[in-house]
Amino acid sequence: VRDERTEILLPEPAQALGALLDVPVPDLATDGLPLLWHWFYLLDRPAQADLGPDGHPVRDTVPAPPGPGRRRMWAGGRVRTHGPLRCGLPATKRTTVASTQDKQGRTGPLTFVVVEHVVSQAGSVVVEERQDIVYRDAGSQLTVADDGPVLPVAEDEWPVEISPTLLFRFSALTYNAHRIHYDRDYCRDVEGYPGLLTHGPLQALAMAEAARGHRDDPRGDFEYRLTSPLFDHQGMVVRAVPGPDGITTSVRDRHGRQTAAGTLRPW
C-alpha cells in the first residue's frame, strides 16, 4: 500500500457537488453516495509549498508527479461498486501502484501507470477502482480538431455549459490545483492550449450522472475512456442509452466530436 487515509464521510462535499451539477442529492445516510461521488472524499491535500509551477504536487503523491518536462493525463479507468458508501460513518481508502509501462507513441515516449484504490467502510470493501494515468513529454502536442458547425442536441442528450466557474468549482471540490483547468493565460501561453481543459473526471462523472437517470443503484462495473481533450469553449453534451448489456454513455462537444465513452454494467 502506497497511501492510506481514513475520514468520516460528511454530507457537505456531496451537497456541494449536487449544487455544482444541478442534480438531486439522495439521502446520504441511507442510500449512500451515487456512482463516482466518492471522488470528493478521502482526498490528497498537499501543502502549498509542495506545489509546482503548474499546480501539480511535486512530491509524496500517488500517482507520482509528472517531473520536469513531462505532463500527466487521466486516460480512463474502471470502478466496481459493491454497495452504498454512506455519509456519517468513517471510510478508509488504500492506494497502490499496480503497474508501470513505457511505450513509444506517435508524439513521443509515453509512460502508462495503473493506480488502484480500495475504499472500505464498516469492515467491508465498498469500492474497487482502477485509474489509468499517462505521462507524456511536455514538448508533444495534443491533437486539437477544428470545431466545425454546431450540431443540434437530441432529446436524449444532456447539454452542459463548460464555464470557467464550473471548472474552478470542480477543481476546488477535488482539491485539484492544476492550472490547465482555471488559468487561461497559463493554458495558452505555457501549454499551448486553445482554452481551459475540462477535467477528465468531470466528463466521467457527467456520464455516471446520465446513467443515474436510468438507474439509481450504484452497484455494478463502470468502465470509461477519455479519448480526446475537451476545452471550455466547445461545450459538453452527455448521453446515456440503456441496453441489454448495460448503459452505454458518451460525451461529445457541441460540434459532435466524442471526447469520452463509458459503460455501466449493473449487477
Regions found by a protein language model. Give the residues of each.
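Short, basic/aromatic beta-hairpin or loop at an interaction surface
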Residues: V62-W74, G195, A206-P218
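Short conserved catalytic/interaction loops centered on acidic-Pro-aromatic/His motifs
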Residues: Q104-R106, D216-G220
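HotDog/MaoC-like acyl-thioester-processing domains
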Residues: R2, W74-I162, L226-H233, V237-W267
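Small/polar glycine-rich anion-binding or flexible loop at a beta-alpha turn
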Residues: G32-L36, A204, R219-H233
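Terminal targeting signals and extreme-terminal segments of soluble enzymes
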Residues: D54-P66, Y193-L202, A206, P244-G246, ...
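A contiguous, surface-exposed recognition patch within enzymatic or periplasmic domains that forms
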Residues: V1-G32, P149-Q203, A210-G213
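Hydrophobic, proline/glycine-rich low-complexity stretches
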Residues: V1-P90
